[in-house]
Amino acid sequence: MMSSRILRNVGLLGLSVLLLAGCSSLRVFFPSKTYETIAPEVPAALSKPAVLLFSKTNGFRHDEAIPAANALLTELAQERGWSVFATENGAIFNPVDLARFDVVVWNNTSGDTLNAAQKKDWQTWLSAGGGAIAIHGAGGDPSYDWDWHPESFIRAQFTMHTMGPQFQDGTAVVENADHPATRDLPERWTHHEEWYSFAESPRDKDVDVLVRVDESTYAPTFSLFWMDTDIAMGDHPVVWSHCEGGGRVFFSALGHQAAAYQTPEMVALLGGALDWAADPSLADCEDKGAE
């Protein structure tokens, strides 16, 4: 059961969305329950590694970020000689189709995107040694119908994001420069973002924190009309990786705006994330899957 703090924050966030964005954002509180049952046709020839870009939204939709992220990830994969297939059809989460991919990217997905059978097949594929990348909105729902998603896949429960202003410059700080996703990043850089806050830091949930945001460099508040809520976390990771069974999961809370995917830092971050997610030898997840 969600805490009273999370419930209050959900209410504040939803009210702000409705006030600022109007009826088009009603799906935040009245999400769609659309589930596909007929899988899309995947090309017969997929060079390896193969990347699946999944961007279905049954809740809030990042209209600009989704195509921008898909474009960058496609370019990065093709530069490596990999194949890419993009879809918003949840029926692709079946054993036959998933077996054809090495990496699955959840690109700003939202809401409950899979039915019960698809969820089971996705968890089985991942824990058996698959590689996954989750971007921004994929970990940005205030509540889920599927506890496994925030608790095991993302390993953090989103509460609120900055508001007043919504988008701010903040200093991102690399904590682990040895990870493929961070090895080409500067130690610190200024990033313009809608900064997510979580119910608690994932640091003690068996994750490798790669990047945190320095909360002294921006205003971690939700301020709108009469509402003024402190959403500081103190310890505030924004990028991390972990093992889920024998599989690899990389999560980045960065990437609300399309412009973010044109910055050299995001190019380096997501390029390295692809390398890591596609190569089991770059993580120590195989042994954990056997435990």
Role assignments for model-derived ranges:
Residues A21-G22:
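C-terminal motif of bacterial Sec signal peptides marking the signal peptidase cleavage site
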Residues P49:
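Nucleotide donor/acceptor-binding cores
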Residues M2-G11:
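Bacterial N-terminal signal peptides that target proteins for export
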Residues D112-E187:
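A glycine-rich, often tryptophan-bearing local segment used as a flexible ligand/cofactor-contacting loop or short
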Residues R5, L53, G59-P142:
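Helical hinge/lid and interdomain linker segments adjacent to catalytic or ligand-binding clefts
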Residues S25-L46, L72-E75, E79-W82, E88, ...:
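Extracellular ligand-binding/catalytic regions of CAZymes and related secreted enzymes
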Residues N58-G59, I92, G111, G139-G140, ...:
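Short, solvent-exposed loop/turn segments at secondary-structure junctions
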Residues P31, Y35-E36, M160-G245:
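Catalytic beta-strand/loop cores that center a nucleophilic Ser/Cys/Thr
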